[in-house]
Swiss-Prot record:
Keywords: Ribonucleoprotein, Ribosomal protein, RNA-binding, rRNA-binding
Name of the protein in its database record: Large ribosomal subunit protein uL10
UniProt gene name: rplJ
Native source species: Geobacter sulfurreducens (strain ATCC 51573 / DSM 12127 / PCA)
Function: Forms part of the ribosomal stalk, playing a central role in the interaction of the ribosome with GTP-bound translation factors.
Keyword rRNA-binding in record: yes
Gene Ontology CC entries for this record: cytosolic large ribosomal subunit
Quaternary assembly: Part of the ribosomal stalk of the 50S ribosomal subunit. The N-terminus interacts with L11 and the large rRNA to form the base of the stalk. The C-terminus forms an elongated spine to which L12 dimers bind in a sequential fashion forming a multimeric L10(L12)X complex.
Length: 174
């Protein structure tokens, strides 16, 4: 690769690192093509970009970004997974793949919204429910008191009508 190509790659990678909500690093030593293709397809379906990048280019690209703390992990074969939208789904795919391929794919570290996270943190992130499920639970929690209040308000007139009806039936019976 000539110098201009490297500079262009560094600039593109720098832009991607700045836009990414989460970045995960992995060691892919010993992976075969079939395994790599499977991982790429799973990550693509989760809207995650996966690249194998030279460590020196990655170190240059990470400068002046909130992902610069990852530079201590730029050793050996390094793959980078960039999540621009949902970090939980990216962590789920990577964590699951690391469990199924423990000898060939190992997570190194990550950055989530500017903060460095360990492999254990990535696993914890993977154990979270998806964003949609969390939003649904939150909305259900917010909606529950309102629904109960409406039920109570509806019960008061209903009770009043039933009481009036009982009085009417009692008077008609006499």
């Amino acid at each position: 690769m000539n110098k201009e190509t490297k500079q262009q790659q560094v600039a593109e990678l720098h832009d991607k690192l700045q836009r990414a909500k989460a970045v995960f690093l992995a060691d892919f030593r010993g992976m075969n093509v079939e395994q790599a293709t499977t991982l790429r397809n799973e990550l693509r379906s989760a809207a995650v970009e996966y690249k194998v990048v030279k460590n020196t280019l990655l170190e240059l690209a990470s400068r002046d970004t909130d992902k610069e703390s990852l530079s201590q992990h730029f050793a050996g074969p390094t793959a980078i997974a960039l999540s621009y939208d949902d970090p939980v789904s990216a962590a789920k795919v990577l964590s699951k793949f690391a469990k199924t391929q423990p000898n060939t794919f190992k997570l190194k570290a990550g950055v989530l919204t500017g903060k460095a996270i360990s492999v254990a943190d990535i696993q914890s992130l993977a154990d979270l429910p998806s964003r949609e499920v969390l939003i649904a639970k939150l909305l259900g929690t917010i909606n529950a008191p309102v629904a109960n209040f409406v039920g109570v308000l509806a019960a008061v007139p209903g009770s009043f009508v039933r009481a009036l009806n009982a009085i009417k039936v009692q008077k008609e019976g006499n």
